[in-house]
């Protein structure tokens, strides 16, 4: 199901993450999107982003994300959300993360909005 409004991307991402739907999570990213999971680390394109999300989904955790803002200019939108994640590693250790994300989304020719840039945790978030 295509996301036809940028302010619905966060909600759709949360729903898909909750059921570990990797294929439809990937559909929320442009083919040449950039995901920057840590300072100085950039993952480019579906193959690299898929590998990262696959590892995160293995933690079998719960993601809670609240959208803070969605600023739109034409076919581009800047999204900001506050999120927390709690899961377990393969060894059973508790994994807890959280922060404030910033994402740039773009509307495609098909009318669907997708992430072009995903910064899960801003430096001061």
Give the role of each language-model region.
Residues 3-9, 22-74, 96:
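A solvent-exposed, acidic/Ser-Thr-rich amphipathic alpha-helical stretch
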Residues 29, 83-85, 119-121:
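Short beta-strand segments enriched in hydrophobic/aromatic residues
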Residues 74-85:
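A short hydrophobic beta-strand element
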Residues 86-95:
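Short, cysteine-centered beta-strand-loop-beta hairpins and adjacent loop/turn segments enriched
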């Amino acid at each position: 199901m295509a996301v036809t409004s940028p302010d619905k991307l966060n909600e759709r991402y949360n729903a898909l993450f909750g059921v570990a739907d990797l294929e439809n999570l990937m559909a929320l990213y442009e083919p040449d999107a950039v995901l920057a999971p840590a300072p100085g680390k950039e993952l480019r394109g579906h193959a690299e982003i898929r590998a990262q999300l696959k590892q995160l989904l293995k933690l079998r955790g719960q993601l809670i994300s609240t959208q803070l803002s969605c600023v739109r200019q034409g076919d581009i939108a800047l999204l900001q959300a506050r999120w927390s994640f709690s899961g377990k590693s393969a060894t059973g250790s508790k994994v807890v993360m959280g922060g404030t994300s910033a994402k740039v989304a773009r509307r495609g020719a098909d009318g669907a909005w997708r992430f072009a840039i995903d910064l899960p945790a801003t430096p001061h978030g």
